[in-house]
């Protein structure tokens, strides 16, 4: 690892390995790195292969030779790809010397690369929340204190605010949620949502899966679980509040009644830069709030009846074991079915609820702490199969969308 100088600044450039380089987080991370050549250098890239032209352009721009592509056909088309196949990203991590591994892969397939990064001793800049949620106890056991630095804006905000007090001074953590594009809609109106509508987030620019998860509030459920795992605060002391402007990213309330909040315009380059350079800040990483003009910041309670995903996540987290992996796997199956037009938007969370209920009733072993990665994968396979059955029985998607208030 790079050693700090006497003034607390990093000595030399940090070597960064970017997993998921062609996605939203990965491309923005490369922008941050390119803008700060005195601080960072890219030593490897990994991607699925769906955006092969983007990956090849990134390889040319960074000059790296260590590249991993999961899709073997895409790797053959690209030529000269040293790591290919389902385990390509994991092998890349194992065979590349890096100070920081940014895991921006999508889905629970990021678990093995996450564990490999922790095993290597590199700092893990974690955007792939699913690997922490699925791996839970395994990931925490593999991590040294402070080795995982979150990339999500909410958890980056919490990490910054928690500097303002000791652990025993924390009363509660407050996650903010924009409410997504369907804030204020009824459950009946949500039945008519189309994938196009669900893909239009009001404040953030994200990848398609994160955008859909934000619309269903599943993303906030995943972030609730991630908050507990990262900071060790019990679930009953983690709140979620709707903040439509997405300026305040999270808050920490302390035992004396004071609350610290982190505020900045919605721009992922800020938490990305902080995760890459932690604990040092990168000057000019993103724009700051402009207090010279009038503005309003609103906060309101989350409607858990219309959007039950957060409370389902709380239940899964409190149950422990592999239940959070089951929550995530069920969502991935149901979300894919919605995007394919096979089920309604509301069926996503209904499927998660069905799978969690079945796990509670028929598979109590899933609440036990997993002994290894295979235990997690077994739980995920069971959850996917159960979710597929639920999807097959769910209400089909409606043909057209409705806007609230329009008959």
Curated annotation (Swiss-Prot):
InterPro entries in UniProt: DXP_reductoisomerase, DXP_reductoisomerase_C, DXP_reductoisomerase_N, DXPR_C, DXPR_C_sf, NAD(P)-bd_dom_sf
UniProtKB keywords: Isoprene biosynthesis, Manganese, Metal-binding, NADP, Oxidoreductase
Alphabetical list of SUPFAM superfamilies matching this protein: 1-deoxy-D-xylulose-5-phosphate reductoisomerase, C-terminal domain, Glyceraldehyde-3-phosphate dehydrogenase-like, C-terminal domain, NAD(P)-binding Rossmann-fold domains
Residues bound to Mn(2+): 152, 154, 223
Lineage: Bacteria, Bacillati, Actinomycetota, Actinomycetes, Mycobacteriales
Positions with a binding annotation for NADPH: 22-25, 48, 51, 128, 130, 207
Enzyme Commission numbers on file: 1.1.1.267
NCBIfam families (UniProt xref): Dxr
Reactions catalysed: 2-C-methyl-D-erythritol 4-phosphate + NADP(+) = 1-deoxy-D-xylulose 5-phosphate + NADPH + H(+)
GO molecular function, one term: 1-deoxy-D-xylulose-5-phosphate reductoisomerase activity
Protein name (record): 1-deoxy-D-xylulose 5-phosphate reductoisomerase
Pathway stated in the Swiss-Prot or TrEMBL entry: Isoprenoid biosynthesis; isopentenyl diphosphate biosynthesis via DXP pathway; isopentenyl diphosphate from 1-deoxy-D-xylulose 5-phosphate: step 1/6
Cofactor(s) of this protein: Mg(2+); Mn(2+)
Domain of life: Bacteria
Purpose: Catalyzes the NADPH-dependent rearrangement and reduction of 1-deoxy-D-xylulose-5-phosphate (DXP) to 2-C-methyl-D-erythritol 4-phosphate (MEP).
Gene3D superfamilies reported for this sequence: 1.10.1740.10, NAD(P)-binding Rossmann-like Domain
PANTHER family, per the entry: 1-DEOXY-D-XYLULOSE 5-PHOSPHATE REDUCTOISOMERASE (PTHR30525), 1-DEOXY-D-XYLULOSE 5-PHOSPHATE REDUCTOISOMERASE, CHLOROPLASTIC (PTHR30525:SF0)
Keyword Protease: no
Any Gene Ontology biological process: isopentenyl diphosphate biosynthetic process, methylerythritol 4-phosphate pathway involved in terpenoid biosynthetic process
Similarity-based family: Belongs to the DXR family.
Binding site for 1-deoxy-D-xylulose 5-phosphate: 129, 153-154, 178, 201, 214, 219-220, 223
Natural source organism: Mycolicibacterium paratuberculosis (strain ATCC BAA-968 / K-10) (Mycobacterium paratuberculosis)
